[in-house]
Amino acid sequence: KEDAVVYPPQLSREQCSSEQTARYKAELAKRLALETTDNVEVKETEILKDAENLKDIEGLKYIDVLSHSEFSTDVSSTLAVDLTGGFGVDFSFIAPLFDRAIYCERNPQLCTIARHNFRVLGLDNACVANSEAERLLQDMPPANLIFIDPARRDGHGGKTVAIADCTPDVSALRPLLVSKGRKVMIKLSPMLDWHKAVADMCGSVAEVHIVATGGECKELLLVADSDSHDSVSVTCVNDTERFSFTHTEGEQQPLPPLQDAGELFAASPATATSQHAEAPAPLYLYEPNASIMKAGCFGLLAVRYGLRALGRNSNLFVSNAMVNGFPGRQFAVTGCSTMNRQSLKALLADINSANVAVRNMPLSADALRKKLALKDGGDSYVFGTTAADGTHVILLCKRI
């Protein structure tokens, strides 16, 4: 249908953003656009020259030809360029925030689909360019924002993670990217180590955004520019939850004093191994969301919210007073036990089913569920973990 959105091949859909992550990138792009608008230094003659050159680049197949009117002589006019357009989900959310927007994609079929869809969506300020990203980047005019989402599959169709293995190689393009874009937003695999990604960009990264939805880490976003940054701002996002810090702040903050099994049972560690007890009242358990887990800022998280870690590698936290606004799941602990058979029997006497999870424990969740003879599901939550003193403990909880 002429008024219906057309969908691309399966491989292109695999790397598409969800609406929720696309909206977050649009929110970020809007802020970046405002930050760059007052710093436009491109002269009128340069804009016209670049616009004219852009129409005559050898080897480019433009579906929509850029005109002088699209490259306004108003130097306050804003431009966004998506160098790896794909299906155009991110572009369709970012483009309306700018006066002009260029969609670049090397696949001619996707360009045709994008051109149709942009018309359906009413994106009158969008231009579609069938080109390699590297070629357009070389000859395009300066932009307020460049967005790039390198393909994360190799020539054999296998998935890649490292920046250098993606197409195009953003680290190799870095000097040209930051010279042409006042701000550059780079979308990377959530599997990538964000510390290494920042290092690979040689000081150009100003911001890192770790984006999760529904408890699953979806995207790693870098914001780069031509400045050199010793301190990088890191924002962890999970749906409506936000947690921000500088990377030096996160690295320098160690875990506060840990919670050992003796404190959990209100007894000494020496006797805790044979005990089952009602948890000290009240006791609350906190599980960080996926973006926090990816960021690894556990010491800073504990300090900011006044929490204690159950163990050095448990990534679970406790407090005796409920904390509001914690970025993750919160539970009320109703009881706790060691792995002692009689203690477990007393703890789970009235529990037939539960949601079982393990953290830093030599058992899988399925193995622990089987050992405890529990069915999956229900309103109860069972966490198996290792306390600071090495004791394996089981916590029975209710979700708050």
Model regions and ranges:
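SAM-dependent transferase fold signal centered on methyltransferase-like domains
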Residues: 1-400
